[in-house]
């Protein structure tokens, strides 16, 4: 059993079933989550007998670093990890105002296949289990010697299509006995699966929800996000409203700006109208053209789009890519690795 896949309560139960006291579970989790010790033999406040018992019944699966790139611009660090079955995933460590943020993956590949995203181009393999999601945080902290303060579920994959494992991983990471990450420092990014957003509302987790909208009309969104043909923009907005009413959290809207596609004044006005009445913040993101045929709009046009939103009462900011020199955007490192193996 992988300890990283277990909630605190479940781990305590298993420890007690082995005849150990509850406080032993606390000691073990302290070694793992605070000291980043992943080998039972190195847990020196446990007896040899206890360490042997743990080794026979549990494992601590930490992914292997296949590749690591550090930006010379902003110290953003991109990791490519190999899992126990040989599949690879990506995680990114970012720095903002002195705080470390981990951007983590939830699936190997992605079934959504957004046309501007590198991850979808490599195909979908499988969901990550809760332990594989949690392990990314520990692997980042172990290597970087940084304490992750914020977590964004914004790496490879669509989190709401791996709902149970994602929610379980969040509950593990926010537990005071493990990472003790504040729930308001957790952000989940989704293209918008209405029924799953409604289900998330029932969790009462009050995490930050980011909707990857990227268009203000179904006609345009259908062209870049195929799943929109199943879930319309209005259905997504209605579900987001429900989430906001339950959580009282400001929503983040992610909007990729693509030259001469969704960057017109009319697009901005329609977006403002669509978001009217919601407490939202819009991240305007010039498209990354590395693995697509799309181009970034001119800076003046990006600024103009932002200005229209702000003048319409919508908070907005331009989010320029971090780690541009190391291809830190989702899926790029993995797809390069896959391509190299085919040569």
Swiss-Prot record:
Q: Where is the Radical SAM core domain?
A: 96-325
The protein's name is Probable dual-specificity RNA methyltransferase RlmN
**Keywords for the protein's UniProt record, in alphabetical order:** 4Fe-4S, Cytoplasm, Disulfide bond, Iron, Iron-sulfur, Metal-binding, Methyltransferase, rRNA processing, S-adenosyl-L-methionine, Transferase, tRNA processing
Q: What else is known?
A: Reaction proceeds by a ping-pong mechanism involving intermediate methylation of a conserved cysteine residue.
The entry sums up its family as follows: Belongs to the radical SAM superfamily. RlmN family.
Q: Where does [4Fe-4S] cluster bind?
A: 110, 114, 117
List cystine links: 103-330
The terms describing its cellular component in GO are: cytoplasm
Which major enzyme category is it?
transferase
Q: How is the cofactor bound?
A: Binds 1 [4Fe-4S] cluster. The cluster is coordinated with 3 cysteines and an exchangeable S-adenosyl-L-methionine.
Select a single GO molecular function from the record's annotations and give it. tRNA (adenine(37)-C2)-methyltransferase activity
What is the recorded function of this protein according to its Swiss-Prot or TrEMBL entry? Specifically methylates position 2 of adenine 2503 in 23S rRNA and position 2 of adenine 37 in tRNAs.
